[in-house]
Amino acid sequence: MKKIAVYPGSFDPITNGHLDIIKRGLSMFDELIVLIAYNAAKSSLFTVQERIEMIQEALHDRKGVRVDSYDGLLVDYVRKEGGNVILRGLRAMSEFEYEFQLALMNRRLNRNIETVFLMTGYKWFYTSSTIIKEASRLGGSPKGLVPEVVFRKMQEKYPLMNKGK
């Protein structure tokens, strides 16, 4: 039986910290689905389609991974895809309490689905999509913190970023 994990997030944009979790997750599971969860409460920099394309390009050389989007209950998606694991990355202990609550709710909704937490690599500990977007908007460069495809797309969105190269 294939071990299928789903790694959900907004990925707006995907960062090298996310890629670290994906690459490590691929060593644990037969298939990893990077799931862009649609969140109407958040205003997004990139459309869902743009995010799918950037993630696919960033992971083009990886086998066993695919990218999808979903607007619904996560456990329903995992079950529909034949998965049994939700993969989550943690940067700090402060994130654990919230993630733990989500994991317990998902477990209550479907007892056959487990949540696996991976600590982000120390190199990416401080990296978040929100911080990267804010720094870029103000002229800072995210080079080295995001895949090259994301860097190029962010240059289009944030003209100030181009001045600081």
Swiss-Prot record:
ATP binds at S10, F11, H18, G89, L90, R91, E99, W124, F125, Y126, T127, S128, S129, T130. The record marks H18 as: Transition state stabilizer. The keyword Transmembrane helix does not apply. The keyword Ribonucleoprotein does not apply. Pfam families: CTP_transf_like. It is an enzyme of class 2 (transferase). It catalyses: (R)-4'-phosphopantetheine + ATP + H(+) = 3'-dephospho-CoA + diphosphate. GO terms for cellular component: cytoplasm. Homohexamer. This is Phosphopantetheine adenylyltransferase.
